[in-house]
Amino acid sequence: SARDFAIENNAEDLLAFATSAIREAGNGAEVLQHVRRKTGVSLSGISGDQEAAITYFAVRRWQGWGAGRILNFDIGGGSFEFSTGTDALPDAAMSVPLGAGRLTREFFDEQPPSPKQTKRLRRYVREQIEPVAQRLLAFGEPNMVVGTSKTFRSLARICGAAPYSAGPHVKREMHVTDLR
């Protein structure tokens, strides 16, 4: 478990966060208490914007200070986090309720989805992302765009990137043209 790993590696603190699913659950507080009772780990519920900022910080540390302006995307099940910056903390970090699971449930009532459903979803996502994109791009063009989620890992794999089993230090790239 993450707790055992932290103990074995002499971590001074274990910081565990609960994201979109807990933020929106009617019984979120009960779930947090249950996890603490069963595991001894205290989860902290964080806002979507905090989630975006924490993810940005991890990306910045991984990519290094010389990476220039980073634009980070993180698609979860319930939310989509965006962040950008040139330093340890982001210039902007925000979250919108556009997670993959949420959108699938709300827009697709058949599998595979019909062209009409897909078109409706695309229109909706573009409308929701437009103000976010304007705010992020106001800080300047990114030197690097990073995707940090299983959704992006799966897309990169489909586009020919190395599999997850190749390890974390294998460079994986995906280009816009790969997605067309």
Task: Give the residues covered by each predicted segment.
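Helical "lid/coupling" subdomains associated with nucleotide-phosphate turnover
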Residues: 1-11, 15, 19-69, 84-180
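A generic, well-ordered mixed alpha/beta core segment in the N-terminal half of proteins
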Residues: 71-79, 83
